[in-house]
From Swiss-Prot:
Annotated coiled-coil segments of the chain: none
Protein name: Glycine--tRNA ligase alpha subunit
Localization per Swiss-Prot or TrEMBL: Cytoplasm
Keywords, in A-Z order: Aminoacyl-tRNA synthetase, ATP-binding, Cytoplasm, Ligase, Nucleotide-binding, Protein biosynthesis
Keyword Nucleotide-binding: yes
Gene3D superfamilies: Bira Bifunctional Protein, Domain 2, Class II aaRS and biotin synthetases, domain 2
Enzyme class, spelled out: ligase
Catalytic activity: tRNA(Gly) + glycine + ATP = glycyl-tRNA(Gly) + AMP + diphosphate
Amino acid sequence: MKKLSFQQIILILQNYWQDYGCAILQPYDAHVGAGTFHPATVLRCLGTKPWFVAYVQPSRRPCDSRYGMHPNRMQHYYQFQVILKPSPDNIQDLYLKSLECLNLDLKTHDIRFVEDDWESPTLGASGLGWEVWCDGMEVSQFTYMQQVGGIECYPVACEITYGLERLALYIQGIDEVKELDWNGQIGEKALKYGEVDFEAERQFSKYNLEFADSEMLLRHFKDSGEQCERLVNVNLPMPAYDECLKASHYFNQLNALGVISVTERASYILRVRYLAKICCIKWLELSSE
């Protein structure tokens, strides 16, 4: 059986969850640290309206910059996110069937659900959940989203996050992300993951760790926070949330540079959490009118 390419894995997951009834959304056009930060998760997990969506989200974590030299850790990577609200009772079975659709043999791989309650300090979000391990490496995360922006979620939504690169390593049976088959072609049309993303990985690692201007980032963090508050005050929670995302990314960049002390780090996290909270409160207030 021919092994699935990286882009085929994405297409199969999209088709699988579309057949279940999910709307297939597009990635959010902002720098986010995970698929959870997409407003389709943060804002739409709030309120009582049912919400069934799935999407790919490119994600950035400056602290994971490794100049493209690490086999499976990068500052830029892809997640596949599924939100099911209200959460179905058979969610684990649905997930395992999605792995089978990806030709992952559940009999030869050790798939384990490891209890791991999830929390995002900057989003004020938390929930009960599990990490999903394949042969000892985390490839997915399940979370019953109980709180976002410090607000209780009712009904509780289930979030599934697939780590696409790590999952692809097992499906293709290789050890390094840069060697992943991206498009399933041969000859001059063939592309590996490294040919698509790893020059950017090298350059952004240098930027994140060596050349980012910390004074400029500090100014941007302050400005984004103030703009977020102004927009919330005029009933514009969605553009306000964009500013919250910017502040979160600036904080992550400052953290990667190592210019924030342990004490300062806590205050930055509290600031971003406050911004997320006021966006969520205003979103809920307007959507319930």
